[in-house]
């Protein structure tokens, strides 16, 4: 087995979730959610796992289970900004690979985390790596909550959008705007997976980058990097990852998986 290059996993976690308050501390089989996520990051082979939060209760929960935790400001507009604060505080080398593991994804596959980190290490011209998988359902292509990514010949991101990209003129135009009548895509359409690996150099510069008009329009923060000329390498996987936890119903579904005897 080939060992992955060294990488650091940072788990940004905040309590102020509008749909699910205190989400990082939700119990999953006797452990807080943020700890379950940290365990997945450790299984991925991260040389360092950090929980980053503005809430002392989250830091205490992580430390009680043997994980390193760091206090961050409460006014960060995104998880990337929180990572940027951590990168600046620790003074990591420019080429250090830092993976943002979302704090509400306790079922994330450690192999995917490791592979995205390795993908960035293998693409020195890129500042960021992420992942995507093929879409086979036309409903997903036209769903604005499903973010699509268009790629170049080297699987580097050209653009991310909530709109259906690429638009197939011949396949879609005859049916527009009847989305229900749209055929399944006969060409590669990729759904973006919100897992990112960054070079520490980029994280330190990120807070100084002005927001991009396309970022504000689409409400996709990764477009800021493209707008400012950074390259994003995209790892193609065959299937979608397990969904994260956003609502009480999501939490109940995942809690059931952590019950004794569940598979």
Swiss-Prot record:
InterPro entries: Cytidylyl_trans (IPR003329), KdsB (IPR004528), Nucleotide-diphossugar_trans (IPR029044). It catalyses: 3-deoxy-alpha-D-manno-oct-2-ulosonate + CTP = CMP-3-deoxy-beta-D-manno-octulosonate + diphosphate. GO terms for molecular function: 3-deoxy-manno-octulosonate cytidylyltransferase activity. Disulfide bonds: none annotated. One of its GO terms (cellular component) is cytosol. PANTHER family: 3-DEOXY-MANNO-OCTULOSONATE CYTIDYLYLTRANSFERASE, 3-DEOXY-MANNO-OCTULOSONATE CYTIDYLYLTRANSFERASE, MITOCHONDRIAL. This is 3-deoxy-manno-octulosonate cytidylyltransferase. The lineage of its organism: Bacteria, Pseudomonadati, Pseudomonadota, Betaproteobacteria, Burkholderiales.
